[in-house]
Amino acid sequence: MDLSAEFKRWKAQCLSKADLSRKGSVDEDVLEIVQLLNGQEQFFTTSSCAGRIILLDRSVNGSEVQKQNCCWLLVTHKACVKDDVIVALQKAKGDAILKFEPLVLHVQCRQLQDAQILHSVAIDSGFRNSGITVGKRGKTMLAVRSTHGLEVPLSHQGKLMVTEEYINFLLKIANQKMEENKKRIERFYHCLQHALEKETVSTTSQPKEKVNTSYIRKKKRNPGKARGKRVNEEHDKELENNDHDDPGISDTIFPEDY
């Protein structure tokens, strides 16, 4: 079957499905990106989370929402305050863990070249742990993600193991990471707009073969460098200060059965 026609069928099926996420809708901070991608014929999003602060209890008892053998005691996509965490901790019966999870966005792409363009946008926006996978059925997926996270245990078997002062300290860090995550999302949106405009101009002004060759040659430049080196100079120092432990990402593409 023609891969282009198959991609259109996949996209129509995915976008027609009901949102089965816990929230039931796309997070506000990532909505513009999702709408922009789904409005392009070469992309569609399969899942997304704008970033969140969560408090989990590794106990399957209780009335709280359960996921992967955990109870969600607290979930917020905004800055979190100490009092909310203290109240939520009173429900913990197992090992309570405070986490900050940055943006995660999964995008199916029509072809590898489209995924490469989106991958460059992600890396240049600070999401240095992004990667491409190609499935056995020809599905090309891009995952936008970073290591700009946080995970700290607070209680064990229902007993609080840290002070309220330390919880307040952790929340300051988590809230700072949330703010940085939002800046990267905004940067991603603007970089995506620019990349799509540039690709449209290139496609209309040059034969398609030349556009493909030019882009691939650009991607192969300095293959030994870590992807972190490709962040724009104007915000490279900022990213290094905020996310200095991010690993470099190679161009390795590995098969995955989607």
Swiss-Prot record:
Pathway connected to this protein: tRNA modification; wybutosine-tRNA(Phe) biosynthesis
Xref: InterPro entries: tRNA_yW-synthesising, tRNA_yW-synthesising-like_sf
Biased composition (Basic and acidic residues): 230-247
EC number in record: 2.1.1.282
GO MF annotation list: tRNA methyltransferase activity
Phosphoserine carried by residues: S25
Region described as Disordered: 199-258
Gene Ontology process terms (BP): tRNA methylation; wybutosine biosynthetic process
Record's compositionally biased regions (Basic residues): 216-229
Domain of life according to the entry: Eukaryota
Pfam families xrefs: TYW3 (PF02676)
Entry keyword set: Methyltransferase, Phosphoprotein, S-adenosyl-L-methionine, Transferase, tRNA processing
Enzyme class: transferase
Catalytic activity: 4-demethyl-7-[(3S)-3-amino-3-carboxypropyl]wyosine(37) in tRNA(Phe) + S-adenosyl-L-methionine = 7-[(3S)-3-amino-3-carboxypropyl]wyosine(37) in tRNA(Phe) + S-adenosyl-L-homocysteine + H(+)
GO cellular component: cytoplasm
Similarity comment: Belongs to the TYW3 family.
Function: Probable S-adenosyl-L-methionine-dependent methyltransferase that acts as a component of the wybutosine biosynthesis pathway. Wybutosine is a hyper modified guanosine with a tricyclic base found at the 3'-position adjacent to the anticodon of eukaryotic phenylalanine tRNA.
Protein name, per record: tRNA wybutosine-synthesizing protein 3 homolog
Gene: TYW3
